[in-house]
Curated annotation (Swiss-Prot):
Protein name stated in the entry: DNA repair protein RecN
SMART domains registered for this protein in UniProt: AAA (SM00382)
Reported function: May be involved in recombinational repair of damaged DNA.
Family the entry assigns: Belongs to the RecN family.
Residues the record lists as binding ATP: 36-43
Domain of life, source organism: Bacteria
Organism ancestry: Bacteria, Pseudomonadati, Campylobacterota, Epsilonproteobacteria, Campylobacterales
Gene Ontology terms: biological process: DNA recombination; DNA repair; SOS response
SUPFAM superfamilies for this protein: P-loop containing nucleoside triphosphate hydrolases (SSF52540)
Keywords, ordered alphabetically: ATP-binding, DNA damage, DNA repair, Nucleotide-binding
Length: 524
């Protein structure tokens, strides 16, 4: 690719969909035109490509896409790459249900879409649902233009975004504080009750386990006492065994040591049992019940103690709530004043440079044979972008009443400005029948715009007219053979024949071929 930091789809493989039994296409960078007779499966091919990215339902039993996208952060999703420029492989397998994989790692459809968000930008006749020409985009374009013209503008935008984000955070915290203030009395009562309950219990982290052990000992005290007493009685006569061993010349030191250790352990357990005799079983069970309730409510004794500390801190903050509210109020008013001042400065820049930006937009629109649109600044509620919005003025037309061809060309005009001033789109453009219902002159204008965009982004465009295929770097033909749909990348001779077909069908084939050769030669 010309800009290898941008995304590039290098291969598409499809198995068994409604049109293609088998499809395997390799792609290059730049503009790829997709042509073919009506009904052969051009839109199905594009739908398969979009299905791999989760933008459409999968239309095949298996779709596989190889993709280069060095800027994608795949490690967040557990997919590690030694080389960020190595191809990623997206696989979609459809059986009883549809499953998605990235480099053989299974992902949900939503996770895949989140990872690949913004990687594919699609222009089609269903354009208004995408709400692409919104005031956020238009304001970003104007700001990008100003930043390109005047280096003093960018620090203002950065400062406003930082201060406004801080302002929003403080306002949210103040609202929470004011909510607490409204219910301060009730909240204090509840927190004091919880504090008193936890303090009265005097919680110790190992107490619950110790009481459980005591309960266990109490439940089997008599049986254990008898067994320990009998064992100790037996151990009193074990000296006879050691004496006998020594008298016949064998060492009894190991046995003596083991018997002494056993005696000590049994005496220790006997002491525990004697201590249990002084315990009140009812009090032990009552305390265990209380601690069980605490563990159920807080998860553990440790968490309950942490909660007690938090409650004490909350009670302290409630006593200081009026002081905190006043501090928040002063800081918020200070930030508002600073943000408004920045908004005024930003507004001044926008007013100064709007005419120049409108001139550029009009020039792009004129190249695409559109009436000159213009952008008008209007006041808007303050945000991190300022206190203005841009409204698109289409002379005597409304955005909603534009034909699909007019809208697509207008969108192309803005995309050309995006490429020039924002430079933030690193994905792939997919264009569905951009030149349908256009005049030859309009189609030529669209093809030139796409050629310019293809210097920055890989583009796939279904085309019904000759201009896009003639200017395209790659030409893919979808056709039928023996009632089966196939697709292939055309060489130069095949491109001439396909463009000739698009020009004149089967009639006047010689003149059509001659014209096709001229079109291809002109773009070399």
């Amino acid at each position: 690719m010309r800009d290898f930091n941008n995304a590039q789809i290098t291969r598409l493989k499809v198995r068994q969909n409604a049109v293609f039994e088998k499809l395997d296409l390799e792609f290059k960078d730049g503009l790829s035109a997709i042509s073919g007779a009506s009904g052969v499966g051009k839109s199905v091919l594009i739908a398969s490509l979009l299905g791999a990215f989760g933008l459409k339902e999968s239309n095949a039993s298996n779709i596989e896409v190889e993709l280069i996208a060095p800027f994608l952060d795949t490690e967040e999703y557990g997919i590690f790459r030694e080389d960020e420029h190595e191809p990623l492989v997206i696989s979609v397998i459809k059986k009883e249900k549809t499953r998605y994989f990235l480099n053989q790692t299974s992902l949900s459809k939503n996770t895949l879409k989140a990872l690949l968000k913004g990687l594919i930008k699609r222009l089609s006749n269903d354009r208004f649902s995408q709400n692409e020409l919104n005031d956020i985009l238009m304001l970003s374009l104007l700001d990008g233009y100003i930043q390109n013209e005047n280096k003093a503008f960018s620090p203002l935008l950065g400062a406003l975004e930082e201060k406004f984000t801080r302002l929003e955070k403080l306002e949210k915290e103040r609202r929470l504080l004011e909510d607490k203030k409204r219910f301060q009395k009730d909240l204090e009562e509840r927190l004091n009750f919880e504090k008193m309950k936890l303090e009265r219990l005097d919680l110790k982290e190992d107490e619950y386990e110790r009481l459980l052990e005591q309960k266990k000992l109490l439940s089997s005290k008599e049986k254990l006492n008898d067994k320990i007493a009998l064992a100790l009685e037996v151990l009193e006569n074990t000296h006879k065994i050691t004496h006998a061993l020594e008298s016949v010349g064998h060492s009894a030191e190991f046995l003596k040591s083991a018997l002494l250790e056993a005696s000590a352990l049994l005496e220790k357990e006997q002491a525990k049992l004697e201590e249990c005799e002084r315990l009140d079983i009812e009090k032990v069970l009552e305390r265990l019940g209380m601690l069980s309730g605490i563990i159920k409510d807080y998860g553990s004794i440790m968490h309950a103690k942490e909660r007690l500390g938090h409650v004490k801190n909350e009670l302290h903050n409630l006593k200081e709530i009026d002081s905190h509210c006043e501090t928040y109020h002063k800081e918020i008013e200070r930030l508002k004043t600073e943000c408004l001042k920045l908004c005024e400065e930003i507004s001044g820049f926008r007013k100064e440079y709007l005419a120049g930006f409108n001139a550029l937009l009009s020039a792009k629109a004129k190249d695409l044979l559109l009436k000159s649109p213009s952008l008008v600044l209007e006041d808007a509620p303050m945000s991190e972008k300022g206190a203005q919005k841009l409204v698109l003025n289409l002379q005597n037309s409304q955005l909603e009443t534009l034909s699909s061809g007019e809208y697509s060309r207008l969108r192309l005009a803005f995309m050309l400005l995006e490429m020039e001033f924002l430079k933030d789109f690193k994905g792939v453009l997919v264009l569905d029948e951009m030149d349908s219902n256009l005049s030859g002159e309009e189609s030529l204008a669209v093809s030139k715009a796409l050629e310019t965009l293809s210097s920055h982004s890989q583009i796939f465009a279904i085309s019904h007219q000759v201009h896009i295929p003639a200017l395209a770097k790659n030409h893919i033909l979808v056709f039928k053979e023996n009632h089966k749909s196939l697709a292939k990348t055309l060489n130069n001779e095949e491109r001439v024949l396909e463009i000739a077909r698009m020009i004149g069908g089967s009639e006047n084939i010689e003149s059509a071929i001659s014209f096709a050769k001229e079109k291809l030669k002109a773009q070399e």
